[in-house]
Structures are given as C-alpha cells and as structure tokens.
Amino acid sequence: MAEKILNNDVLTSLQKKNRKQIQVWLYSILLLCLAIVLVGGATRLTGSGLSITDWRPIHGVIPPIGAEQWQEEFLKYQQIAQYKLLNRDMTLNAFKVIFWWEWAHRILGRLVGLLALLGLIWFWATKRIEKNILLKLTIVPILIAFQGAIGWWMVASGIGQSNLTSVSQYRLAFHLITACFIITFVTYLSRGFTEYSEKPANQRVQRFAGWLVVLILIEIYFGALVAGLHAGKVYNTWPLMDGQFIPDGLMQHNPVWLNLFENPLTIQFIHRFFAYFLFFVTIIHAFYVQKNIPHSTHSRRAFFICVMIVVQAFLGIITLLREVPIGLGLIHQSVALAILCFSVVHWRATKEAYRAVE
C-alpha cells in the first residue's frame, strides 16, 4: 500500500511527542560527537594518540589498575617508534597523562556508539519512528561503527612502522572528515524534525546553502592535513609565507599531485587561501539569500555565517603566529565545528521539515 504524505499540521500530539524525543536523542548523539572530536584534537595536540597500542573494544573500557598493570601498558608503548625516537626520557607519570587522553577519546566513542544503537532499537521497538525516516536513523549507528574502525586503522599506521612517530596524515584526515560527515548528517536529521517559522527557500538558495557546507568540509579536510603534517608549526608568518605571497617550493614533489597531501608548505598555502575563498563565497551567499528572501531568518543566518568565518580566520592567524599552542588549537577546531553545525542548520532550514506519513 502506497504511503500517503500528509501536511505536518495534522500531526497528532503523540507524533509530535515522538518526534521531540527522537530529536533530543539525535542532539545527544551530536553533543557526544562534538566532544569526541575535541578530545581527539587534544589527543593529537598532546601527542597522545599512540599511547594505547592495541584495540580491545570490550576489555579496553577498563584502564590499568595498580602499578603492575600500568607498567605493563607502559612497556607496550616503549616498543613503538614514537617512544624510541621521541620519548625515551618519558616517565611513567608522563605516560599516564597521554594514556588518559587516548582512553577518554575511545571511551567517548564507545558511549556514542551505544547511545546510537540502543536508542534506535528502543524507538523502533516502541514504534515511535515514522516509516519515512527509519532508514535515515538506521544509518547513524552504522556510520559511528565505521568511524570506530577507521580510528583504529589510523592508530595502526603509527604503530607498525619502525620509523614513524605519528599516524598517517591521510588516515588522520579521513578520520576527521568522517567524523564531520557524521556531525553533518546528525545535525541535518535532527533539524528536520523542527517546525520552521520561516517558509522554505527556493531551490537555488537551498543548493547554494548545501554547496557552502561542502566547501566548509573541504576546508576542514585540509586543516586535518595541516595537523597531520604539523604544517602549522612552519611558516609562522602572515600574510606572507617565508617572505612571499606565493612561496617557492609549492610543487617541489613529484608527481605534482603529491604536494597536495605531503608537502607542508603546499598544504598550509591551500588551507590559508581556501579560507579566503570561503570567506568571499559566504559573502556572496549572504547577499544572494538577502536578494531572494529579504529580511528573513534565512538571510540573517547567512550573514551570521560570514561573521563566524571572520572570527575563525582571526583565530587561525593568531594560532599560526603563536605556533599552534594547545589551547588556541582547540579553540580553532571548536569554532570550525560550530561553523559546520550552524551552516548545516542553515541549509536544512531552507527546506521544509519532514512530512508526516500515514
């Protein structure tokens, strides 16, 4: 039997209550995902990501207890290249600090996975999920499980090699962009349950808002490559790089495409100039929305994105000039996530809420 699409003004009080509960569940997942990314950023900035050298999805929940277990964990760390080449003078107490960062990152990952899976099962078993959104909600725990596997795949890249003291920048960037995709997806889903006071925008505005989210994700991806190659700790001047607007050595690697992923100078250059490009696109977008839907909530959101981009650019410059201190690095990452989430909210709000299904 074909589904009948209804107008949302015919939603029953029970359907509205169910939607509100699902939305709260999705927002809880979103908050945990944001926390995981920030703890992951701290884990990276403190060099803690390789402190746990194995992956035990169940038993790994329990940290070392007592001096003997701590010493055993420390001995495992002493077998990898990061300890041998960088941290030979590390004490057990110093090891505990980096261990706790990585442990917290993994625990948060398990928590969000359980929240997503158990929440989905409960809403499905109690028949609170409408047919047209069941598949979308099912994708959430699948993506989170996939992200957990990517996380270990990333860590493994820095453990199995005798000459590597950090994880692969390719895998780090993939890990972060997958997390950002999950954040984008969950934000988009959760906002779809909101009844908007503003009418939907036209299709051109909707598409422009969607492409803006794509551009923000690209900028975050190159930011991850900057982090993976420690490119923020070189060429710490602005607006020039090494005394030049377009520095020498941008294409020094062969083949040329390798510079986009392995040349710190090129990657920092792209991250800088893509930020300028993104700023101009957000301005164009804001005026375009204002022209099409003047003095609307949509246009106000579009202009606020411009403000957020300016703040983020200022933070990026200060972080670069100060050679990426941990605090500023985390603030820069936090604002990037805020821009992403708000841009997704703006994009989703240009459309109508999920329609009721009979």
UniProtKB/Swiss-Prot annotation:
Pfam families: COX15-CtaA. It is a multi-pass membrane protein. Keywords: Cell membrane, Heme biosynthesis, Iron, Membrane, Metal-binding, Oxidoreductase, Transmembrane, Transmembrane helix. Its main location: membrane. Heme binds at H271, H332. Pathway: Porphyrin-containing compound metabolism; heme A biosynthesis; heme A from heme O: step 1/1. GO terms for molecular function: metal ion binding; oxidoreductase activity, acting on NAD(P)H, heme protein as acceptor. One of its GO terms (cellular component) is plasma membrane. One of its GO terms (biological process) is heme A biosynthetic process. InterPro entries: COX15/CtaA_fam, HemeA_Synthase_type2. It is found in: Cell membrane. It catalyses: Fe(II)-heme o + 2 A + H2O = Fe(II)-heme a + 2 AH2. Its EC number is 1.17.99.9. The chain crosses the membrane at residues 22-42, 107-127, 139-159, 173-193, 208-228, 269-289, 302-322, 324-344. Belongs to the COX15/CtaA family. Type 2 subfamily. Catalyzes the conversion of heme O to heme A by two successive hydroxylations of the methyl group at C8. The first hydroxylation forms heme I, the second hydroxylation results in an unstable dihydroxymethyl group, which spontaneously dehydrates, resulting in the formyl group of heme A. This is Heme A synthase. It comes from Bartonella quintana (strain Toulouse).
